[in-house]
C-alpha cells in the first residue's frame, strides 16, 4: 500500500501559501527571484492559447535547478536504524524558492496550470516506473480537449503522442487517487 499523505499535505499547504503569491503580485519588488518571475509568467500566460500556456509553464518550471530529496535515516532509542525517508513533496511556493526533484516539478506545473484555469479533472500527478531512468519517476499527465494525454516530464520536451518507457504506478489530483498497478 502506498502512503498518499505527502500529496494531501502539499495540497493543503499550497492553499495556505496562496497569500504569498498575492502579496508578490501586489508588491513585486518585495519578492525574491523565482517568485517575482512567477507573477510575470502567470500574467503573460493568461493571454495565450491553452497549448502555449502549457508549453510556457513546462519550460519555466523545467528551468528550475534540480535538487534531490535528502535522505533522512530514522533510529530507535537503541540506535538501530528503523527506516529511511527519501521523498518529501514541495509546494509550488517552496519549489520556486528551493528547487526540487521530479515530483516537485510535476506538482509545480500542476498548480500553475490550475491557476491558469485548466480543470483539475484534466490533470494528474503520475508516479511511474521509467524504463529510461531505471527507477520511479513523477510526471504531470494532462488530458487535452481531444482526449489525448500529454506528459510533462522534468527531463524531456512535452510528450504529446508517445508514452513509451513509462509504466504508471499511481496518479492523483485534488479529487482522487488512481492505482494503476496490475492486480494478479
Enumerate the language-model features and the residues they cover.
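A structural boundary/capping signal
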Residues: 1-184
